[in-house]
A protein has these predicted regions:
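Acidic, PIN/NYN-like endoribonuclease modules and their adjacent C-terminal/linker elements
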Residues: 2-4, 8-9, 16-22, 35, ...
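Acidic, metal-binding active-site segment of PIN/NYN-like and related structure-specific nucleases
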Residues: 48-65
Length: 122
């Protein structure tokens, strides 16, 4: 089942967005929303308001936001984290990101109200 994905500022990339669309996902970016450069909390609120699962390369801040939202009993459509390595050659490629999302979805594990580290789904 394809996802409605919101790529935050850190993950906003035209090529990645195109690959995700080709894989059947609906993709929205901060540029399209007119909120580029907004606070991470605003990006998450936007994603929630519009039913998007958030995709980010800023795991630390969104782990904290997820925990904070849990304490407030607030729901979200899921947060997908990508950890970047100091050695750039070890970073996930755009194709690997799309494949990791497909692997996660194929597992049947719930996405809503959870955090998933895509690096583990390569």
């Amino acid at each position: 089942m394809p996802l409605a994905l919101y790529l935050d500022d850190c993950a906003d990339d035209d090529t990645l967005a195109a690959l995700l669309c080709q894989a059947g996902h609906r993709v929205h970016t901060p540029r399209q929303a007119g909120i580029s450069g907004a606070l991470d909390s605003d990006h998450l609120a936007y994603a929630v308001r519009h039913g998007y699962t958030l995709l980010t390369k800023d795991p630390g801040d969104f782990l904290d936001l997820h925990t904070h939202w849990q304490t407030l009993n607030r729901a979200h459509s899921g947060i997908l984290l990508i950890y970047e390595e100091k050695e750039v050659s070890k970073n996930m490629s755009r194709v690997q990101i799309v494949a990791a999302i497909e692997n996660l979805l194929a597992s049947g594990i719930a996405v809503a109200n959870t955090i998933h580290i895509l690096n583990q789904w390569r």
